[in-house]
Amino acid sequence: MYIEITSVCNLACSFCPPTSRAKNILKLDALNKTLDQIRPHTKYIYLHVKGEPLLHPRVDQLLEASHAKGFRVNITTNGTLINKNRHKLLGKPALRQINFSLHSFDGHEGSENREKYLGDILDFVREAKEHNIIISFRLWNLQREQVSEIAQRRNRETLEILEKEYNLDYKIEEKVQPGKGIKIAHNIYLNQDHEFQWPSLLAPEDDGKGFCHALRNQAAILVDGT
């Protein structure tokens, strides 16, 4: 179950369509009400849909409320605010997994200093290991056509930093497959995939075969309750 805790984001990534919805954050009492409603159906929740969850000023209280009602929490973040929020995340027993969308660095036109961006994330991950938090690094920026030389170089720079951090004796590209993750350390994974395309009623009709998990084994509740 996905629960959007804010519709606001601090980046403007090329792969993420802008929202026309009003800026909003989820109040604690609204989360508690939602958790009571979904409790018979799941014990795992994802505190994100659109927006950057670490912009929520009381994300620590949301985690505490989730734990009080017996839920395990996964969070997906662009990672830019991890230093500011580390004290709100570490030591929270509800927090099961954090996914870092590393492709957001190159997806946002104004990004600067890749080394510091990744360094802050890796510094957090080192401490998160002591709390048995699962970490997933995501690079969902592969193109189905020929990848540009610039995109290849940018990805290689990111992967080199990860290879050095975890003392890997291989290049990650040699083992990773689109849509499948690889384990690079205890509780630490890397997932590389094609760029995610957000569904749109304005997009060209796709006659290909596919399968949608929505409302079968997953659902999302937006910050306004819809």
Task: Give residue spans per PLM region.
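Conserved alpha-helical substructure of the radical SAM core
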Residues: M1-I98, H108-G119
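Accessory C-terminal segments flanking Radical SAM cores
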Residues: Y2, P178-T226
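Structural recognition of alpha->loop->beta junctions
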Residues: R39, R86-G107, I150-I182
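Class I S-adenosyl-L-methionine
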Residues: L54, W140, E165, D169-K171, ...
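Conserved strand-turn element in the central/C-terminal portion of the radical SAM core barrel
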Residues: V73, F105-G107, F124-N155
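A structural signal for short, well-ordered beta-strand segments and their strand-loop junctions
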Residues: N74-T76, N99, I134-L139, K171, ...
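A structural motif corresponding to the C-terminal lobe/cap of the Radical SAM core domain
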Residues: D120-E130, G208-C212
